[in-house]
Amino acid sequence: MYLSRPTGVARFAASSSSSSSASLFPGVDVDTTTKTGALHFEETKERIKKLFDKVELSVSAYDTAWVAMVPSPNSLNQPLFPECINWVLDSQHADGSWGLLHNDQLLMKANLLSTLACVLTLKRWNIGHDHMSKALDFIKSNIASATDENQRSPVGFDIIFPGMIEYAKDLNLNLPLAPTNVDALVRKKELELRSCRSNSEGGKAYLAYVSEGIGKLQDWDMVMQYQRKNGSLFNSPSTTAAAFMHRNDDGCFDYLRSLLQKFDGSVPTIYPLDIYARLHMVDSLQKFGIARHFKEEIRSVLDETYRCWMQGEENIFLDASTCAMAFRMLRVEGYDVSSDQLTQFSEDIFPNCLGGYLKDFGASLELYKASQIITHPDESVLENINSWTSRFLKHGLSSDSVWSDRTDSVVKQEAVNALEFPYNATLERLISKRAMESYSGDIVRISKSPYACLNFGHQDFLELAVEDFNTLQRIHLKELEELQRWVVENKLDELKFFRLHLGYCYFAAAATLTDPELHDARIAWAQNGVLTTVVDDFYDGGGSEEELDNLIELVEKWDPDGEVGYCSKDVEIVFLALHSTVCEIGRRALVWQGRSVMRNVIDGWLALLKVMRKEAEWSTNKVVPSMGEYMEQAHVSFALGPIILPMLFFVGPKLSEEMIGSCEYQKLYKLMSTAGRLKNDIRSYDRECKEGKLNILSLWMIDGGGNVTKEEAIEAIKGDFERAIRELLGLVLQENTTIPRACKDLFWKLMSIVNLFYMEDDGYTSNRLMNTVKAMFEQPMDLDALLNK
């Protein structure tokens, strides 16, 4: 929409045509119409793919006005960038204001800031008197918002807005403001300045960032220390314009000129933002569970980000959020990035930068998430960041408000999720479900002024995610029915000693292996999960010694009609279920692997049964093993071996005998199983202690000779758990190893589901987990409800 100029108002000639639009993104058609019918899945995907091509930023009236104020070096009475003045003339809203069109009533401070900046521009060049009159009416009507603590405040508002009021006096512009309003604003500015100047390096960075509000009193030598390679100050057009007016710096001029060439008569509030915006987009697609549809585009973004990382790109390392996101996403995808680059964000150094001074909640959240990707034993910088950010986030959640470029409710909910579900206890389907349920549609951020970017969370992300989630849910329900038939056909429901937890077992598979084509892997995971629970219950009191030995002998011979025979109906049911299931897995795996894997799977089961038999003997004979002896058996008896191996055959890569027998495979398996066993033993200690069962916690206290308390033992075991998962993650993320990455990922995912299950109780008794399982299978996502909540 173009706004007409009053008749007779002069217009500056610009070197290039200028245009304006009420749309956040001129020239970009943003369809926000709710689709109630079937989604055109491929069309939605294509629209999202186009977002990778270009980062679209909204125009900032505030920053454009400051650039418009810059005089020509040849004549102080002529503007250097007349096209910006034309944009200001064209872009006033009907209510007399300038600024981003939005529905947030808490952004009135931003509107006041942008409107006053545009008024100063017009007054500076003695043009647009009718525009100014309408704008002054707007300011007069809304000035109360300037001191309203409930309003979202642009960065530096308490310095910049009073500073512009003082500048208006220099221009002989009479603002319709009551002296009491002006005095209150000036007092806030003075308090803010005193606070900044007493805060060393962080305060200096902040004062430099809001230089336009300080004007002639600014220490411009100090400000120019923050100049970047692209000539800007903080990638901020307004700060850079103010610096150029006072220092006539060539770098500042080159930056401003390049912006005008790119954005055709107007500027955004921050530029460049490409790296951050694209990383944020990738992160959003991953959280929504639809990243697999954009593998090539995501790889391209990460390759480019890694190139910039290795070149020391300022736009990564001078921004905490960007640096933290880049580190996390690159490391998780196997790129070699050092945590040393995050030293600048440790607790004692972070306050020295702008984000640290602002106590940026969003940046701290990104740093917290990055700090969890520890893959080496000596990454103390990540431990430091994890410690202070977790404390900072928890404190922020208990306070009324935090500072962030996003709305409080959105960023706080993300923090709640991040703290409650750390990286080592996350499941893809649960993450995507939470992302959809918390979708706000808010693509607006606030810096010195509000700005919008489609890459931050286009509605198409939600539409594609909902369709994808519901499609997978239908697949999962069919697979669950298949598994229910399998239970009945194999008579597992007739076993009296058995805790049937089919829903949990399949939930673990479905929430982790989300690709539709991974049907065989999900079925194998669930079936073997059920069967390991069967044999665990059988060897944990459900069977006699004769039955336990009988089952082992049957598996060794692997002949259901052989001479061994069955000493009981329970043994017959267990063995025949195991035999038929393993044989079916072998038939399916032959298609994927091109070779028989039956022996591998059988050997895995045999190893588990023998270890469980050994532990049953310990229990019967009241043997108290050493901690080393216990863990050597217990990591196997945790029963992940028969689950993980069959899955690996169904995820794509071909696994040779040499790979399965490699030291790397054994290490992955042992680390995963050890971590799971330690977590299980901590959670189940009280119950197992009452039942007289062995547990690493009780053995630790026994080994301490009575000098180790339960709490001390728990802390020690937690330390062992953390070391195990760090080493596991490091091995999973390591490139160019024997085991393919797609297979290594399953070790981490299986460990994560175990960790999640044992975050509360013993994994099977949590009501919240039970409700989560039911919701994932029974509740489809409703797009209209999500958009209209």
From Swiss-Prot:
Optimum pH is 6.8-7.5. A motif (DDXXD motif) lies at residues 536-540. SUPFAM superfamilies: Terpenoid cyclases/Protein prenyltransferases (SSF48239), Terpenoid synthases (SSF48576). GO terms for biological process: gibberellin biosynthetic process. One of its GO terms (cellular component) is chloroplast. The N-terminus is blocked. Keywords: Chloroplast, Lyase, Magnesium, Metal-binding, Plastid, Transit peptide. Binds 3 Mg(2+) ions per subunit. PANTHER family: ENT-COPALYL DIPHOSPHATE SYNTHASE, CHLOROPLASTIC, ENT-KAUR-16-ENE SYNTHASE, CHLOROPLASTIC. Catalyzes the conversion of ent-copalyl diphosphate to the gibberellin precursor ent-kaur-16-ene. This is Ent-kaur-16-ene synthase, chloroplastic.
